[in-house]
From Swiss-Prot:
The gene is his4. It comes from Schizosaccharomyces pombe (strain 972 / ATCC 24843). CDD domains: GATase1_IGP_Synthase, HisF. The lineage of its organism: Eukaryota, Fungi, Dikarya, Ascomycota, Taphrinomycotina. This is Imidazole glycerol phosphate synthase hisHF. IGPS catalyzes the conversion of PRFAR and glutamine to IGP, AICAR and glutamate. The glutaminase domain produces the ammonia necessary for the cyclase domain to produce IGP and AICAR from PRFAR. The ammonia is channeled to the active site of the cyclase domain. In the C-terminal section; belongs to the HisA/HisF family.
Length: 541
C-alpha cells in the first residue's frame, strides 16, 4: 500500500514520512486535488497554526476534496492541527474556514492553572472502555502533545459511529483523538511519541482498529493535574572540532576545550549515534545546540542539516535545534529571513527551533519601543508561521550580586548562596554570543518580552552552574517559572537523579535538561526516570 501525504508547505513533515517508511510502507505526496481522489490511504499532517494550514488548503483547492475523502470510508488520518482543521473554525484564526467534517470551534487553553502551550507527554484514552486499545492506543501509554489550541470535550457531539479519546490538562479535558474504523485523527504526534506512537501508526496503516487489552496496559496513569509527565531532555552541544568534524562536546562554564596543553575541543562522540542512544534509553526530547553557529552562516551549515536528517530517520521523539536561527545574508548578498532559516531546519527534521542571542537583541528593542511588537523579529515571524510551540528561547544568564535590592534596577532574589563579599541578593544578567558578552537586561525582562513576542518555551541555562554537577540553580528556575506563563526547561548543573527531583518539586518546572552526565553515562536517563517514579514524580517510562 502506498500512503499519500498532503503537501501544503508546512513544517516538519519529514518525521511523519520517516515513521511511515520505518514501518515498511511507501509514501507519496499529494500535490493537487486530483491526487486526493486517487489516494488509497491518506495522511493529513498538521504543522503550523490553524490559519496557515486551512488557508493553504483553500489556496490549493484541497478543502472540499479533503473533506469528501475524510467522509469516504477509505483509510484517513489527521495529525495535530489536522484534527483541528476537521472542525468548522478556530479562535486562533477567526477568518479561516475549516473542513467542517465535524461541528464546533477550536478553543485556546486557558492559562489560569497551567502553562500554555501544552507541551509534553500525556495520556489519551477512550475512558468509557479502557479494556480495549483503539488503533494501538493504550490507556497506560503516553503520547507527545505540543499545542496551544484544542477541541473541548464539553458540549461536543459527534456521529455515534465515532469514539472520542480524551486527554486531561489541568482544569480542562479535551479531544486527544477521534476514531472509527479506517479513521484516526490525533491531537498528539504519533511520529514523535516513541514506541507507543509507532504502534498507533502501524495499527492505522494495517487496519487494526480494535483489540482487547488487560493488566497494566489498561490502567490510566494520571494525577490531580492530569496525565502530563515531567520531561527528561538530553542535550547535544554540537560544534566543529579543529579538524573540521562535527562532534558533540561539553563545556565547563561554557569552556569546551580540554585543560591539557593541546587544548583540543572536548570530543564526546558523534551526534547522530548519541541521539539514537538517547532515544533508546528513554529521552523525552533531544536538543541539538550548534554552539559555534554564530560565527557561520546557517544557510550553508550543511553538516548540521545532515545530522538532523539522519537522526530523524530513526529517532521518534521531538528534536530541537538551536544556533543561527536569525536573519542572514549569504556571501553573495542573498538575504534569508529567520522564518526561512527555521523552515530549512524544520524540513530537515527539527520540531522546534531555539533562539539565543537574537532573542536578547529582540527583547532590548521591545523595551526601547515601549513594549510594542514590531512583527519583524525572528520569534514573531516563526511563531506566526509555525505556532508559538515551535519557538524556544535559550537563555544564558549569570548571577550578579548586590548588597541590597536598591543597588540595581533589575529583578533580584534573596539568595542562600551568598556572594563573594557576603551579598545576600542577586540578579541574573543575560548574555549573548555563547556567554561571551553581557547585556543590560535581566532574565525576567527577557523571558517576559519573548513570551509577548510569541515564544512558546524557555530553555533556562545557568552559566554559574554549567558543568558543575552540583544541581540546578533552584532560585533562578523558580524566579523564571513564576514570571511567565509558558513552559520552562531547567538546564545546567545536573549530576545525580536527586537533582532532577529537587528542581521539579521545588520549582514545578516543566522539564529538566542534562548533557554531560548523559554523554558520559555517569548518570543514565533510565536511572533518573526510575528514581523520579519512586519519588512520586510522574514520568514516561
Amino acid at each position: 500500500m502506498i500512503v499519500s501525504i498532503v503537501d501544503y508547505g508546512s513544517g516538519n513533515v519529514r518525521s511523519l514520512i520517516n515513521a511511515v517508511r520505518y514501518l515498511g510502507f511507501e509514501t507519496q505526496w499529494i500535490r493537487n486535488p486530483h491526487d486526493i481522489e486517487k489516494a488509497e490511504c491518506l495522511i493529513f499532517p498538521g504543522v503550523g497554526n490553524f490559519g496557515f494550514v486551512c488557508d493553504s488548503l483553500a489556496k490549493q483547492g484541497f478543502l472540499e476534496p479533503l473533506r469528501r475523502y475524510a467522509l469516504s470510508g477509505k483509510p484517513f488520518m489527521a495529525v495535530c492541527v489536522g484534527i483541528q482543521a476537521l472542525f468548522e473554525g478556530s479562535v486562533e484564526a477567526p477568518h479561516s474556514k475549516g473542513l467542517g467534517v465535524f461541528p464546533g470551534l477550536v478553543q485556546r487553553f486557558d492559562n489560569d492553572d497551567k502553562t500554555v502551550p501544552h507541551i509534553g507527554w500525556n495520556s489519551c484514552a477512550v475512558r468509557s472502555d479502557t479494556s480495549k486499545e483503539f488503533f494501538g492506543m493504550r490507556p497506560h501509554d503516553k503520547f507527545y502533545f505540543v499545542h496551544s489550541y484544542m477541541i473541548p470535550e464539553k458540549g461536543l457531539i459527534l456521529p455515534p459511529e465515532f469514539k472520542i479519546a480524551t486527554t486531561k490538562y489541568g482544569n480542562e479535558t479535551f479531544v486527544g483523538a477521534i476514531v472509527k474504523n479506517n479513521f484516526l485523527a490525533t491531537q498528539f504526534h504519533p511520529e514523535k511519541s516513541g514506541s507507543a506512537g509507532l504502534r498507533c501508526l502501524k495499527a492505522f496503516l494495517t487496519g487494526n482498529y480494535e483489540q482487547p487489552i488487560s493488566g497494566e496496559a489498561s490502567k490510566l496513569i494520571e494525577n490531580s493535574f492530569g496525565g502530563l509527565t515531567k520531561r527528561i531532555i538530553a542535550c547535544l552541544d554540537v560544534r566543529s572540532n579543529d579538524a573540521g568534524d562535527l562532534v558533540v562536546t561539553k563545556g565547563d562554564q561554557y569552556d569546551v576545550r580540554e585543560k591539557s596543553s593541546g587544548s583540543e575541543v572536548r570530543n564526546l562522540g558523534k551526534p547522530v549515534e548519541l541521539c539514537q542512544r538517547y532515544f533508546q534509553e528513554g529521552a523525552d526530547e533531544v536538543v541539538f545546540l550548534n554552539i559555534t553557529s554564530f560565527r557561520n552562516c546557517p544557510m550553508a551549515d550543511a553538516p548540521m542539516l545532515q545530522v538532523l536528517e539522519k537522526a530523524a530517520q530513526t529517532v521518534f521523539v521531538p528534536l530541537t535545534v538551536g544556533g543561527g536561527i536569525r536573519d542572514v545574508s549569504d556571501p553573495d548578498g542573498t538575504f534569508h529571513p529567520a522564518v526561512e532559516v527555521a523552515g530549512i531546519y524544520f524540513r530537515s527534521g527539527a520540531d522546534k527551533v531555539s533562539i539565543g542571542s537574537d532573542a536578547v537583541y529582540a527583547a532590548e528593542k521591545y523595551y526601547e519601543n515601549g513594549k510594542k511588537l514590531s512583527g519583524k523579529t525572528a520569534i514573531e515571524t516563526i511563531s506566526k508561521a509555525y505556532g508559538n510551540q515551535a519557538v524556544v528561547i535559550s537563555v544564558d544568564p549569570k548571577r550578579q550580586y548586590v548588597k541590597v535590592p536598591e543597588d540595581t534596577k533589575h529583578h533580584v532574589v534573596k539568595t542562600s548562596r551568598l556572594g563573594p563579599n557576603g551579598e545576600a541578593y542577586c540578579w541574573y544578567q543575560c548574555t549573548v554570543k555563547g556567554g561571551r558578552e553581557y547585556r543590560d537586561i535581566d532574565v525576567v525582562e527577557l523571558t517576559r518580552a519573548c513570551e509577548a513576542m510569541g515564544a512558546g518555551e524557555v530553555l533556562l541555562n545557568c552559566m554559574d552552574q554549567d558543568g558543575s554537577n552540583a544541581g540546578y540553580d533552584i532560585e533562578l528556575v523558580r524566579l523564571v517559572k513564576n514570571s511567565v506563563n509558558i513552559p520552562v526547561i531547567a538546564s545546567s548543573g545536573a549530576g545525580i537523579p536527586q537533582h532532577f527531583e529537587e528542581v521539579f518539586k521545588e520549582t514545578d518546572c516543566d522539564a529538566a535538561l542534562a548533557a554531560g552526565i548523559f554523554h558520559r553515562q555517569t548518570c543514565r536517563i533510565e536511572d533518573v526516570k526510575e528514581y523520579l517514579a519512586i519519588h512520586d514524580v510522574l514520568v514516561r517510562t
